Amino acid sequence: MRPMRRFISGVFVVVLAAAFVQTASAAVHRTLVGNFASPVEVVAPPWVRGSTIYVVEKGGRVVRLARGTRTVVLDIHTRVSSGDEQGLLAATFNPHKRVMWVYYTNTAGNSRVVRYRLNSGGGHVISGSGRIILRAAQPFSNHNGGTLRYHAGHLYMSLGDGGSACDPGERAQNPSTKLGKLLRRDGGTWTKVAYGLRNPWRWSFDRKTGDLYIGDVGQSSREEIDFVPASRVALPRENFGWDKWEGSLKDTCENQGLRGSGTLTFPRFEYDHSVGNTVIGGFVYRGSNMPAQRGRYFFGDLSGWLRSADARTLGNRHVLGFQVSDLVSFGENSKGELFAVSLDGPVYRLVDN
């Protein structure tokens, strides 16, 4: 089993992509932006100009790419454990200040979120500005989650259930732990916005509507995309069911059942492991360079396929006419243009054919 196949999912399943073909689409193509060292995410704050992006590398670096020039904004490789599903996994920015948050696994195998201040040009972190704002002990090396997003004045993040199979510690349903949760930073504390998540690796807010889309990686039966309308995001209401449910199927794990007062919420869309093995949540396209794709949700699978769907229903799915090997993330720049990230190194921009 190749380590890249173990990254995120911990499960290798042979993919029968033909079983998932909906409507073929030749309208979207890819163009290579560049190659990086095990990239896992592309992000960009609204205060950068043009096509500038920041690439998060699993080994511990954040690299800015601006007009063809690369700058290492942050290098914390000596603090990061990057084996298996660990590493520097996510970054995001304050849209109003030169502030960046990063999420990584430290050398003890535990999760950290750290806030850094940037110089005025956003080209490097200010020395000594790092401040830890989240500590979470990880009992296993897999199911680390996680994405960071800044939305409506708050920082959000996700954590997996702590790892192993069948959530042996029943953490996703335990309201007293941060594991298996979607969290929101309220002042100096973290509020649990949603729970019952297995490994919410990649998720996003629709920049126009505020709706939330979560790609939650499954165990043996289902890959799922969970949907929360903007009107419900601010309230801790959603229980996505793990490990009592895997998608819309009752799980075979021994468990204590559902806990807490949240509303059991089934996926907006799911697929089984004859189709793929690790869902990669994406973005609703709101850019200008692919006008026919506006309002469509782009997502994919670690096995390499990419799809788009109607953002509200996740129906009317289109197959993109190319693959990205070891697809680990989608990204969005300040203008809403989309990127696809391969753990093998390439970062691609999605463009009209």
Residue ranges and their predicted role:
Residues 9-19:
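Bacterial N-terminal signal peptides
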Residues 315-334:
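Conserved blade-ending motifs and adjacent loop-strand segments that build the rim/top face
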Residues 329-353:
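Blade-level signature of beta-propeller repeat domains, shared across WD40, Kelch, NHL, RCC1
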Residues 41, 90, 147, 199-202, ...:
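Conserved beta-strand position repeated once per blade in WD40 beta-propeller domains
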Residues 112-149:
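Asp-box/WD-like beta-propeller blade repeats and closely related beta-sheet repeat scaffolds
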Residues 31-37, 74-83, 134-140, 191-196, ...:
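Surface loop/turn motifs at the tips and blade-to-blade linkers of beta-strand repeat domains
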Residues 53-74:
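Beta-propeller domains
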Residues 47, 56-59, 86-88, 157-317, ...:
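Beta-propeller domain segments
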